[in-house]
């Protein structure tokens, strides 16, 4: 059962759940907390790679990722990031989220943005128990027009679901946690699998 707005506020008040900066009550609605777009992005460079063999040797996968992913782009205040039709880009939420070991989070994109062709997360919308950090967004523009995305705009909504008990292996305690404490638009680390 997902937390309702009253329970989300109580978990925040008690320190069991942390969202920094703490959202105002107007952004906690029904069963979700609205989150905003941060100012860090990452894109695919123009490249001539025919493919990336995701199950190939780790050093080759790592080298291929280095060739195709841009360095992190940090937008100055007031500037927009333009996502063109058919493009994929990574970004982060403005808010940093810390979940306890007995709570899982879910990120959903905004319906108003989806109706313009913007996918906010291509597949990865679960936020593991024990997670701490900004949430990476996997943007894809499936529409017909470029979309101007500005830091600070409402981009999605988080919901939270208590588990039957604390996870035995929460994300922040796993040795194989590839994205622990991420604050920026971290590129894929599939080569670390």
Curated annotation (Swiss-Prot):
It comes from the Bacteria. Pfam families: DCD. It catalyses: dCTP + H2O + H(+) = dUTP + NH4(+). Signal peptide: none annotated. Keywords: Hydrolase, Nucleotide metabolism, Nucleotide-binding. Its EC number is 3.5.4.13. CDD domains: trimeric_dUTPase (cd07557). DCTP binds at residues 110-115, 128, 136-138, 171, 178, 182. GO terms for molecular function: dCTP deaminase activity; nucleotide binding. InterPro entries: dCTP_deaminase, dUTPase-like_sf, dUTPase_trimeric. Transmembrane segments: none annotated. Residues 169-193 are annotated as: Disordered. One of its GO terms (biological process) is dUMP biosynthetic process. Pathway: Pyrimidine metabolism; dUMP biosynthesis; dUMP from dCTP (dUTP route): step 1/2. The active site is at 138 (proton donor/acceptor). Homotrimer. Belongs to the dCTP deaminase family. Catalyzes the deamination of dCTP to dUTP. This is dCTP deaminase.
